[in-house]
Amino acid sequence: MTKINKWLPVVALWLLPTVGAAQNTQPLVVPFSMQELVARCLVDFEGQPLCQEANNGDLNAQYAISSQYYDAGSAYSDLAMSWAFYAASRGSIPAQKQLAEMFLKGRGVPRDKVQSYEWYRTAAKSGDGEALYHIGSMNMDGIGAIMDRTRGIAYLQESARAYWAPAAYRLGLAFEEGEGVMVNMTQAVGFYTQAANAGIPEAQFRLARFYEEGRVLTKDNKQALILYTHAAELGHGNAQFALATLLRSEGGRLDEVIKWYREAAKAGIVGAQEQLGLILLRGDNGKAEYTEAYKWLAEAAQGGSALAEFGLGRIYEEGLGVVRNRKIAKLHYQKAVELGNISALLKLGKISLSEDKSEEALKYYQKAAGLGRMEARRQVGLMYMEGSGTKKDLVTAEKWLELAVSSGSTNAKYDLSRLYLLTKDEEKAVRLLREAAEAGVAEAQIELAARYAAGRGVEQSASQAYAWCMNVKECRPRVSYDCSRYGTMLDEHDREISLNRLKFLQENNHCSMH
């Protein structure tokens, strides 16, 4: 735009009625006469022919001047409004739409939604797609006119037929959500497709969801990725988040996943902030980045993310990039619990136990157990069995350990076998011990091996003792010694084979042979 001089004239107020104005609206106050406007134009635009063309009644010139003043900022709003009014009142559709926008936003004129609606309606009479979209939307939302969604839909459909893409998107939304029409997902997809093809990012995002979820359309993750990518590249935060999530589930490159999570996180998408923080905290990309992880988890926590609060709790509990502070860790875990994260109850229980607060720990574990957490059920059972935080109660311990077993805890089978030994039910104890050993519980395998070696509760068998000992996969003290001892109990042929195998494992630093 040509330089606009920094002077403001004395405002001369005069009144003109608004074209198509509704009842009970104030007449438009136009600050300048045409003579004053032309004089000002010649100064501001340095004598451009545009000013004289506007003075001669050229509507395009009048609108062009108005538009340049409008773009120059609020200091020139009176001039923009005056030029827009002269052009609009003489039939300039662009000027009518600009005047409608000025009334809607209160720029250069008092904010007046009714006047805005009337000017958009005047422009719409010519079939202008944008104006039809605005009055359709205003009817849908009851802005500047009585809410009439049937009329709003009609205007939006007319606008969409004029190839105004935002109208197609709004119609897609209406048919998806049943806004002024019956829910019709097929229609919604059709309008979203029209809008998406025209480059509307929100339509691309919503259409991608239909492809990803297989609703109405055949499930097609490839097409969903294409649409998410288009919308993401246009800066659509939710599309960036959805793109990262889908790429991750499809086994896409982690650097691409992180890139889009980061873009969505910058756009304020809480889920992206949460996931990016957790990825960086775990070091999924090869190296943990605690400082950036903390930043994103803190932002997500402010947005109400339970997982982010849990992650912050872990950072403080373990001292990951910060000074270790269990007190702060507990605060974050407690917030996570308030937001529905059950795992945080287990963390609180663990911290309480480390602080010798077994009664407090039991309360946390009982709450998690009541919510169905297998690990918590097992821990409650153990605490009742050992009398930790409560009176020793083997009946209650048995109940919780059985619940843990029914939830799938193989470790609880081993614990329950120990309990049955306390209650002198060796048959049950050995049965559960064997089940736990077969499921890979190291303690059960070691105990079962010892029982076979000694013939306690089972028929004595050196080969079984040796076999169960060699099954232990975890690093355990004395396992190498015990396996050697059981090996010497075998007959000469088997003993030679077993000891050679043991020697090989030891020489190759087999973990269980420490």
Predicted feature locations:
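Terminal, low-structured helical/coil segments at or just beyond the last alpha-helical repeat
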Residues: Q26-L28, E474-H514
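Bacterial N-terminal signal peptides
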Residues: P9-T18
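N-terminal leader/linker segments that initiate helical-solenoid repeat arrays
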Residues: G20-Y70, S82, C511-H514
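Hydrophobic face of amphipathic alpha-helices that form TPR/SEL1-like repeat modules
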Residues: A64-D71, Q98-K105, L132-D141, A168-E177, ...
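Short helix-capping/linker turns of helical repeat alpha-solenoids
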Residues: N55-D58, Y70-G73, S89-S92, K105-R107, ...
